[in-house]
Amino acid sequence: MYPNSPSLGRIPLPLPCARQQQTSAYLSKVPVSVAPDLLSPEQFFQASLNIHKNANLPRLLMNGNVLTVPPLSSPPWSYLNHSPLISPGSPPSSFQNRKRRSDEGNSPYDVKRQRFQSPQEQTVNHQAVPLRGDIRCSYPGSPAFPLLQSPSPPVLKGHSSNSGDCWLYDHIDTTLPVAKDKLSKQILDLFQALQQQVCDLKKKDICRAELQREIQQIFPQSRLYLVGSSLNGFGIRSSDADLCLVLKEEPMNQNTEARHILSLLHKHFYTRLSYIERPQFIRAKVPIVKFRDKVSGAEFDLNVNNVVGIRNTFLLRTYAYLDKRVRPLVLVIKKWANHHGINDASRGTLSSYTIVLMVLHYLQTLPEPILPSLQKKYPECFDRTMQLHLVHQAPRNIPQFLSKNETPLGDLLLGFLKYFAVEFDWSKDIISLREAKALPRTDDYEWRNKYICVEEPFDGSNTARAVYEKQKFDLIRAEFLKAWVALRDNRDLYSLLPVKGIMKKMHSL
């Protein structure tokens, strides 16, 4: 399926030469059980020069010129090949700004050269032709096109191989509640059309594994995690996939280190990987690189070291399967919010993560709670200092929460809308999943002068900080009130959503 497979006619990779074995021996001395804050680039460069002192080191070029990267103050990550972009032994400028001479031979790795048509049409230089729709290819200097051999990256302690994480497909009880009324049945029918399928998750994880393989040639101690709705049980078939690249388990400055790393990866994706389409570097509070995987068709958002996203993914995943009603209720509410224009943090409304926290909070605060506070009930499973490679294992043995509350899905949806339309005090209260209740606002900066306050369960930040305009806050409250009145009077999901149209679209995916 991937480059160097028999179907592509590539010859097997040669055995490493003596010089490469020396490099591997050097790298093997680096312990892999600790965070990758081991070598600065300067230290690594010096060690590499000692190993390769009689060899011609490859040059790092960007747009035909040697790239000089301004050093950060004691950066905690290290490069394997001195930089993200490694050229073959011959100068890469031989591929640029000239026509091919008639006396140049055709090697097995010759590829057609393409120019970028426009910044909006970001295809890849040196694209091989033709590319089948079900393969992923890389270009000269990338690990799948090894004109310059490099040692294989180490496997981090506690992790599975690059082929994927087998625990993703562990059996989970996904039986659904019995619907005894029309509205509950409509919710279940829509949920079954919306929910992410196992095949959708596998496609995303295959791309994650292939990207991790590429990135580990640049940052050998790194690990790429699939996070967010794709993994927490609340994803729909059309959900974007969130990726978190972890270089160290300590906090990273998102304005300097993370931006610098993402800019390097953006350049690498842009020029080396044929299966990455439209990579965009977004300089937000948590910077990301957005791109599309041509093979799966999935959209991805890649961040660096935003490790709280890994922890809350598995917290929410545990909540998702505690009670059979949780996932259907959350997915239908997310779809309602999206359809009515209040589910877009980039436009000053609610993020999907915030909406999920609001639904879970409501289920915790019922007179007979459907959900507990997992962080209070099982603190050892959700310790925010736990090593990342243990985070997915800790909640595995938590049993289902046996609630005495048997309220049907239709009534829960109506109650959720009523709670935030007329009962919750937006001006005085903080939504807290960690405490399983509404907390009184304090005068802390995080909550001061905010229209909506939703506590992030691990770092205590406000996940609803994007709602900073009164106009958007009024819109959100108005949609809750309008939906509650419509559903109260009609008891029909069609009064909130064009259900048939949504289901038809989902079935076509």
Curated annotation (Swiss-Prot):
Domain PAP-associated intervals: 409-462
Induction of synthesis: Autoregulated; mediates its own polyadenylation and translational activation during frog oocyte maturation.
Compositional bias (Polar residues): 116-125
Reaction(s) this enzyme catalyzes, per UniProt: RNA(n) + ATP = RNA(n)-3'-adenine ribonucleotide + diphosphate
Primary localization class, coarse: cytoplasm
GO MF annotation list: ATP binding; metal ion binding; poly(A) RNA polymerase activity
EC number: 2.7.7.19
Cystine crosslinks: none
Residues engaged in binding Mg(2+): D240, D242
Single Gene Ontology BP annotation: RNA 3'-end processing
Cofactor(s) the record lists: Mg(2+); Mn(2+)
Single GO cellular component term: cytoplasm
Complex formation: Component of a complex at least composed of cpeb1, cpsf1, tent2/gld2, pabpc1/ePAB, parn and sympk. Following oocyte maturation, parn is expelled from the complex. Interacts with rbfox2. Interacts with sympk.
Family in the record: Belongs to the DNA polymerase type-B-like family. GLD2 subfamily.
Function: Cytoplasmic poly(A) RNA polymerase that adds successive AMP monomers to the 3'-end of specific RNAs, forming a poly(A) tail. In contrast to the canonical nuclear poly(A) RNA polymerase, it only adds poly(A) to selected cytoplasmic mRNAs during oocyte maturation. Plays a central role during oocyte maturation by mediating polyadenylation of dormant mRNAs, which contain 5'AAUAAA-3' sequence in their 3'-UTR. In immature oocytes, polyadenylation of poly(A) tails is counteracted by the ribonuclease parn.
PANTHER family xrefs: POLY A POLYMERASE CID PAP -RELATED, POLY(A) RNA POLYMERASE GLD2
UniProt-recorded name of the protein: Poly(A) RNA polymerase GLD2-B
Organism: Xenopus laevis
Taxonomic lineage from the root: Eukaryota, Metazoa, Chordata, Craniata, Vertebrata
